């Protein structure tokens, strides 16, 4: 086929025309990604300019920059651009690039503007923000799709961008995300409800501080929408103030589907206040306008004109494709004269002009609050339809300390007493958020979730900035198509059982017939005084109409004279809601009665319930409630659940009495009892509370019964019976075994008006209550009367007295003729010890700390060791009162039974065996150790030698702990300490899930002795073990008084023992606690809380304080508490609330435990059980295997301690 020259030229022209347009970027690297095509990454402030060149064999080539009308506070970029057109190319220069220049730049031709032949490059300009700062976008939701413009300023992995809708992550949105445009939500992904404003939030997962908020509504509340055109003023984020540069912009935007000349025959005109705008630019070209007004700047790609103040612009040249025209007035150096109304007029040849005014007003002093954007300020919504109220505002000057915002709600309610102001706080139905949207721009939001009709009203946000207050108000009407009638009575004494009200006659009442509705509705109010009559309406003058915010209806005031039935009807959209109520004059009450126990004494108070009493609870309910179930229910605070009791239901007169009998009551029945009146639809409770006192038998207040009273012959004297109990006992007095009737008994005291010689002798009072009897013995010495017999002779049986005297005489004749005075005293101590074995102790005494009931403790002779089985070796240490020597205990039995025949022990004895007081102190320490059961973290008693106490042989034998005291152990290993603590945990947590501590990972690799090493794992173990031991002592109970690392022993296997239970301090004076001069001297004051320092008050909570100090010692490797404070100012230092600083080797969780132990109030300190739980939780989280190893080691130690009795038991005990 032959082709003519003409056809060839035409074909060549077509081919040339169809060649794609190309775009070139000068001086910057162009990257490519399949998701967005070509792109360039720039940095604001670093890369100043960028030039683009568009090539192609087409007419009218040009580069179209991105439209930026949605950018927050930034003008169009025409002011910073240059352009030059040559044949087949178009050169475009963007100067001083900014973050807001981010977008797609198109190379297009007027011939193929919508063709695939055009080319594009996307430019990212990054500064600080990941997302391009855009203004809040209002979107006309048409049911198809919504664009959430989360555009990024740099190329990112789209998986790191998340979208949240009303604070809920929308996972399905990721598939529609393009970082050039944002998220595209289809109708299937998210559907907006009518009248709703939805809060969208874009988050960048690699940086929690990077996010962006959008509020998308059905329409822009500040825009006028007419025939597919938006006409509105753009509100800048900047705050106008004197001397500032400022701009305002009026926009006309076409949003319809017509793509050809959508703005043809449309124009907008700006007018300034005080005739400052110079007019007269009709029919002028844009170029001419620029010439005639120096303030006019025009960029060809944009359809926006910028004019200085004193300028009026009416017309511009628009291309056939432009969909938006704008007018901007720039103010250079604002003055007070610039304030006023600026008018923007939209002129359309076929319609009436549309006018929008902008009120430019600012505080001359500088302090301002500028409202930038608000959500729709009048809303009518359906019940349970969520919505969002928000305000974006700017403050000047920038001072966050002086800016405050407060949400409130105004509504009228006659029921509540008139106009109400409710301060809104965060809750389930209303959530307040505050965010910063710029350097001086803030965003306050109130999310109304599932609003009820009762949430209608005027919502007010009050913003305060220094001396300026500005309010934004919303009128919210929540409506429901369902009628809702209510009948209520405003009376606090009313008893309401379902639809029956019971109250006294002649009561003044106000009864409300209301419909819960925010809009007008029909309400009918009727009554009757006889149940056989028809309901009838009220006369109008009897009712007062109510038209409140969400309550419509009537109020009726009357005096109750007889039973009356009321009916309230609400009719809405052919639906009816009816409520009935009956007012009658019956009443109710609950009460209880006490029947005393048969063991009660006559003097017990009749109004107090004690254990063992019988209690009868009665609930009186009006007979009108006969159709309801009525029963008693008991809430037990210990069990945290309700216990239902059967009840009797006798009916008397017009009342129903529901009775609950509780016999032989205990303290577990203390609590609140509810009388329940219930049917299928309703439940009402009447409550009464009872308190049951725990009973305790009489007990001695001073732990002994050996007081002596001196009296003068002929003078009066009083004897106090130092016995108490619960209930308070009855007191009966005896003299020499016979009732004493001479004196007058007043409470627990015996008053004798005149002492006689026959009063010389032993008195005792018998204190009796329902739980038992205790006797207190008092010796009265009347001056001039003969001495009485020995004290103990009067408190033992007569036969034992006789035997005792005979034994004493024989001992004096044959056993004591050669004894020294000191030996006599020791002999007396031995005999007194034997006597103590015969006492029985009350339960109250047993509840006292063990060191306070030392006189009532006995020595368990199962611990007795034959001295011949004990080998005493070298001295291990000595102190003021005692000496500790190393030794071996040979097994009492000749059989080995699989154990070593010799046991290493520590042997403690006094420094002066002839000193009776010293020996007494050591014997009391022995009794105390007998009273403490074995525990792997408490020093264990093995046995004792007491048979020859009368000649000074008293030895306390304990297990031998071979590692020395903990304080020296820690100090000696400072140089080898391996710190496993790192910033967020411990170094042994290389694999957190395995939780393998260093001490177990390297166990097989350690070439040095484990005892000579020290690491953080050891410190955690030691801290937990001390808490274990102290919790064991606290449960006995035993108060240590002197817990410190120097009084803690450690074994070669790093198991600790708490030692030195503090009896020495009890028997010395206060000098032990006095401050000394040397900082290194281990002063107890540095381990004591303030109450112990000032009042010498020692409790388990003072031990907890000392435990916290021990932890400080442990994690400072034997450091001295309060190292920077000298001794002479230490007490004042503690008084002012100072505590030790966190040690460098200590995890913040462990330091929290220390600070809890150092609370000023003892009640605020934790128990040792709570300390154990905190420590275990910490170790379990970071090193579970370490915790398992500790528990395994302690179990092994416990088994070893249980075997000590094999070295003490006699052969007969072993075999039989």
UniProtKB/Swiss-Prot annotation:
It is a single-pass type I membrane protein. The active site is at 1042 (proton acceptor). It comes from the Eukaryota. The keyword Ribosomal protein does not apply. Its EC number is 2.7.10.1. Its main location: membrane. Residues 596-691, 697-783 form the Ig-like C2-type domain. One of its GO terms (biological process) is nematode male tail tip morphogenesis. Glycans are attached at residues 142, 195, 206, 245, 283, 333, 348, 384, 402, 412, 496, 508, 588, 599, 664, 703. ATP binds at residues 876-884, 908. Residues 1-789 are extracellular. Keywords: ATP-binding, Cell membrane, Disulfide bond, Glycoprotein, Immunoglobulin domain, Kinase, Membrane, Nucleotide-binding, Receptor, Repeat, Transferase, Transmembrane, Transmembrane helix, Tyrosine-protein kinase. It is found in: Cell membrane. It catalyses: L-tyrosyl-[protein] + ATP = O-phospho-L-tyrosyl-[protein] + ADP + H(+). SMART domains: IG (SM00409), IGc2 (SM00408), TyrKc (SM00219). CDD domains: Ig, PTKc. The keyword Endoplasmic reticulum does not apply. One of its GO terms (molecular function) is transmembrane receptor protein tyrosine kinase activity. PROSITE patterns: IG_LIKE (PS50835), PROTEIN_KINASE_ATP (PS00107), PROTEIN_KINASE_DOM (PS50011), PROTEIN_KINASE_TYR (PS00109). Receptor tyrosine kinase which may be involved, downstream of pvf-1, in the positioning of ray 1, the most anterior ray sensillum in the male tail. Belongs to the protein kinase superfamily. Tyr protein kinase family. This is Tyrosine-protein kinase receptor ver-4. The lineage of its organism: Eukaryota, Metazoa, Ecdysozoa, Nematoda, Chromadorea. The gene is ver-4.
């Amino acid at each position: 086929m032959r082709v003519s020259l003409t056809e060839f030229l035409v074909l060549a022209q077509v081919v040339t025309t169809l060649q794609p347009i190309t775009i070139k970027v000068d001086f910057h690297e162009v990257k490519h990604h399949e998701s967005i095509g070509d792109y360039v990454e720039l940095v604001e402030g670093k890369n100043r300019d960028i030039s683009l060149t568009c090539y192609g064999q087409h007419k009218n080539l040009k580069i179209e920059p991105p439209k930026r009308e949605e950018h927050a506070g930034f003008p169009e970029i025409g002011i910073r651009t240059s352009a030059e057109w040559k044949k087949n190319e178009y050169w475009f220069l963007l100067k001083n690039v900014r973050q807001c220049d981010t977008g797609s730049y198109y190379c297009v031709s007027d011939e193929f503007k919508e063709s695939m032949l055009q080319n594009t490059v996307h430019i990212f300009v990054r500064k600080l923000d990941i997302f391009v700062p855009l203004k809040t976008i209002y979107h006309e939701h048409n049911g198809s799709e919504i664009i959430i413009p989360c555009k990024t300023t740099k190329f990112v992995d789209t998986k790191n961008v998340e979208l949240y809708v009303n604070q809920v992550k929308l996972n399905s949105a990721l598939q529609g995300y393009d970082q050039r445009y944002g998220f595209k939500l289809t109708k299937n992904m998210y559907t907006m409800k009518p009248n709703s404003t939805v809060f969208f939030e874009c988050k960048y997962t690699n940086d929690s501080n990077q996010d962006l908020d959008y509020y998308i509504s059905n329409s822009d509340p500040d825009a006028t929408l007419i025939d597919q055109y938006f006409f509105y003023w753009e509100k800048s984020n900047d705050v106008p103030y004197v001397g500032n540069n400022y701009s305002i912009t009026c926009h006309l935007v076409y949003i319809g589907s017509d793509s050809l000349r959508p703005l043809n025959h449309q124009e907008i005109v700006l007018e300034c206040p005080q005739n400052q705008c110079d007019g007269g630019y009709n029919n002028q070209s844009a170029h001419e306008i620029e010439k005639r007004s120096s303030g006019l700047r025009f960029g060809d790609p944009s359809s926006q004109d910028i004019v200085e103040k004193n300028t009026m612009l009416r017309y511009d040249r628009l291309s056939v494709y432009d969909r938006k025209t704008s007018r901007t007035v720039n103010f250079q150096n604002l003055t007070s004269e610039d304030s006023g109304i600026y008018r923007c007029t939209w002129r359309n040849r076929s319609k009436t002009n549309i006018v929008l005014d902008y009120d430019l007003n600012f505080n001359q002093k500088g302090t301002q609050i500028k409202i930038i954007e608000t959500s729709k300020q009048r809303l009518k919504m359906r019940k349970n339809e969520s919505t969002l109220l928000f305000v974006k505002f700017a403050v000047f000057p920038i001072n966050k300390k002086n800016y405050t915002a407060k949400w409130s709600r105004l509504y009228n309610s006659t029921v509540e007493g008139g106009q109400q102001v409710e301060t809104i706080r965060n809750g389930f139905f209303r959530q307040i958020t505050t965010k910063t949207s710029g350097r001086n721009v803030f965003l306050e939001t109130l999310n109304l979730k599932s609003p009820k009709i009762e949430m209608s009203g005027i919502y007010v946000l009050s913003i305060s900035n220094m001396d300026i207050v500005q309010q934004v108000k919303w009128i919210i009407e929540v409506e429901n198509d369902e009628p809702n009638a209510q009948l209520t009575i405003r009376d606090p004494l009313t008893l309401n059982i379902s639809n029956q009200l019971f109250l006294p006659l002649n009561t003044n009442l106000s009864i409300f017939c209301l419909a819960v509705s925010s809009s007008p509705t029909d309400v009918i109010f009727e009554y009757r005084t006889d149940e056989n009559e028809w309901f009838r309406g009220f006369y109008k003058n009897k009712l007062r109409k109510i038209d409140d915010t969400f309550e419509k209806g009537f109020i009726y005031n009357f005096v109750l004279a007889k039973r009356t039935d009321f009916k309230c009807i609400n009719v809405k959209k052919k639906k009816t809601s009816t409520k009935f109520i009956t007012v009658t004059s019956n009443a109710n009450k609950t009460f209880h009665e006490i029947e005393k126990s048969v063991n009660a004494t006559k003097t017990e108070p009749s109004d107090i319930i004690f254990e063992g009493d019988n209690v009868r609870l009665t609930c009186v309910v009006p007979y009108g409630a006969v159709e309801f179930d009525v029963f008693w229910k008991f809430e037990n605070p210990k069990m945290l659940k309700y216990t239902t009791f059967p009840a009797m239901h006798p009916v008397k007169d017009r009342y129903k009495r529901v009775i609950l009998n509780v016999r032989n009551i205990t303290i577990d029945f203390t609590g609140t009892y509810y009388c329940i009146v219930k049917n299928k639809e309703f439940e009402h409770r009447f409550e009464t509370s009872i308190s049951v006192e725990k009973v305790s038998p009489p007990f001695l207040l001073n732990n002994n019964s050996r007081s002596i009273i001196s009296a003068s012959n002929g003078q009066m004297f009083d004897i106090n019976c130092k016995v108490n109990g619960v209930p308070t006992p009855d007191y009966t007095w005896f003299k020499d075994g016979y009732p004493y009737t001479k004196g007058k008994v007043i409470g627990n005291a015996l008053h004798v008006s005149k002492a006689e010689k026959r009063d010389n002798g032993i008195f005792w009072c018998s204190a009796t209550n329902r739980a038992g009897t205790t006797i207190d013995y008092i010796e009265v010495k009347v001056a001039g009367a003969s001495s009485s017999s020995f004290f103990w002779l009067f408190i033992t049986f007569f036969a034992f007295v006789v035997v005792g005297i005979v034994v004493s005489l024989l001992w004096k004749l044959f056993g004591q003729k050669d004894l020294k005075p000191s030996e006599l005293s020791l002999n007396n101590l031995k005999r007194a010890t034997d006597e103590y074995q015969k006492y029985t102790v009350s339960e109250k005494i047993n509840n006292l700390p063990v060191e306070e009931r030392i006189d009532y403790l006995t020595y368990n002779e199962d611990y007795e060791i034959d001295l011949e089985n004990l080998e005493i070796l070298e001295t291990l240490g000595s102190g003021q009162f005692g000496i500790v020597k190393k030794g071996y205990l040979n097994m009492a039995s000749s059989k080995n039974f699989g154990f070593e025949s010799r046991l290493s022990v520590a042997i403690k004895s006094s420094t002066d065996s002839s000193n009776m007081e010293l020996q007494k102190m050591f014997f009391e320490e022995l009794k105390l150790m007998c009273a403490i059961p074995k525990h792997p973290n408490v020093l264990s008693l093995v046995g004792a030698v007491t048979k020859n106490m009368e000649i000074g042989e008293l030895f306390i034998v304990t297990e031998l702990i071979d590692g020395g005291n903990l304080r020296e152990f820690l100090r000696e290993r400072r140089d080898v300490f391996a710190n496993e603590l790192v910033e967020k945990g411990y170094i042994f947590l290389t694999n957190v899930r395995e939780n393998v501590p260093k001490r177990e990972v390297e166990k097989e690799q350690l070439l040095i002795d484990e005892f000579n090493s020290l690491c953080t794992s050891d410190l955690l173990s030691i801290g937990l073990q001390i808490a274990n031991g102290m919790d064991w002592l606290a449960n006995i109970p035993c108060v240590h008084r002197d817990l410190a690392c120097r009084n803690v022993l450690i074994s070669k296997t790093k198991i600790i023992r708490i030692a030195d239970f503090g009896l020495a301090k009890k028997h010395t004076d206060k000098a032990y606690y006095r401050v000394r001069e040397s900082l290194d001297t281990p002063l107890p004051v540095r381990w004591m809380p303030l109450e112990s320092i000032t009042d010498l008050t020692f409790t388990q909570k003072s031990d907890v304080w000392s435990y916290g100090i021990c932890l400080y010692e442990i994690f400072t490797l034997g450091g001295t508490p309060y190292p920077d404070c000298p001794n002479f100012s230490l007490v004042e230092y503690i008084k002012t609330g100072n505590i030790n600083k966190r040690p460098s080797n200590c995890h913040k969780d462990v330091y929290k435990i220390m600070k809890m132990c150092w609370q000023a109030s003892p009640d605020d300190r934790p128990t040792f059980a709570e300390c154990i739980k905190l420590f275990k939780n910490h170790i379990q989280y970071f090193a579970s295997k370490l915790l398992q190893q500790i528990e395994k080691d302690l179990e092994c130690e416990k088994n070893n301690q249980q075997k000590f009795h094999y070295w003490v038991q006699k052969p007969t005990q072993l075999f039989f």
